[in-house]
From Swiss-Prot:
Pfam families: MarR
Gene (name only): hpr
Keywords: DNA-binding, Repressor, Sporulation, Transcription, Transcription regulation
Occurrences of domain HTH marR-type (ranges): 12-156
Keyword Transcription belongs to the record: yes
Residues annotated to bind DNA: 62-85
GO biological process: response to stress; sporulation resulting in formation of a cellular spore
Signal sequence range: none
Function, as annotated: Negative regulator of protease production and sporulation.
Top-level taxon of the source organism: Bacteria
Subunit comment: Homodimer.
Protein name as it appears in the record: HTH-type transcriptional regulator Hpr
Length: 189
């Protein structure tokens, strides 16, 4: 049986088709799992992500939240404002930078984030469950290096540096900062 040689345009189209279909299918499950996880806390995905980013960065500018949360600046601002209205974070300006707006988690915001982390149930997470056979076969979960390389090219080194830092934080931060209840609860989950 002869195979047609794919020309660059066809190859690009086929590759793009695969990325679109696979990422859309994956995101549908990720989104459903994430919504179900945080629903009891009266949060949406953007709000939860803002709490997480603000915690991970020890406070952040709206621009940083937009960048690392992969959302428009107005989305980051509007959802941060809703969180401020609920008393979960505060807005401020820095003396050295009056142009940017910064957010910081309040103790209530830290507490709610901790509650969400403690409520995470891997057995209710579709992507996690679907990955278990790979973990059992290879002894570890997929590293996602191809996807990470693509995201690095799209969003830059600083995005991936924050991604690496927050990933490292989940596994190692409790050793350095055992007083951090959010990280401690992740290690126990």
């Amino acid at each position: 049986m002869e195979h047609e040689k794919l020309y660059p345009g066809q190859e690009a189209l086929l590759y793009s088709h695969k990325i679109v279909q696979l990422s859309k299918a994956l995101w549908k499950t990720v989104e459903k799992d994430w919504q179900n996880w945080i629903k009891p806390f009266d949060l949406n995905i953007n709000e939860h992500h803002i709490l997480w980013i603000s915690h991970a960065l020890g406070g952040a500018s709206i621009s940083e939240i937009a960048k690392y949360g992969v959302m428009h600046v107005s989305t980051a601002f509007n959802f941060s404002k809703k969180l401020e209205d609920r008393g979960l974070l505060t807005f401020s300006k820095k003396e050295t930078d009056k142009r940017n707006t910064y957010v910081q988690l309040t103790p209530e915001g830290e507490s709610l984030l901790l509650e969400t982390i403690q409520a995470f149930r891997p057995e209710e997470n579709g992507v996690f469950r679907a990955s278990l056979p790979l973990q059992e076969l290879y002894g570890k979960f997929p590293e996602l290096t191809d996807i990470s390389a693509i995201v690095r090219r799209l969003y830059g080194d600083s995005f991936m540096d924050i991604f690496a830092e927050t990933s490292k934080m989940i596994t190692e931060e409790a050793d350095r900062r055992p007083q951090d209840p959010v990280i401690d609860s992740i290690k126990k989950a």
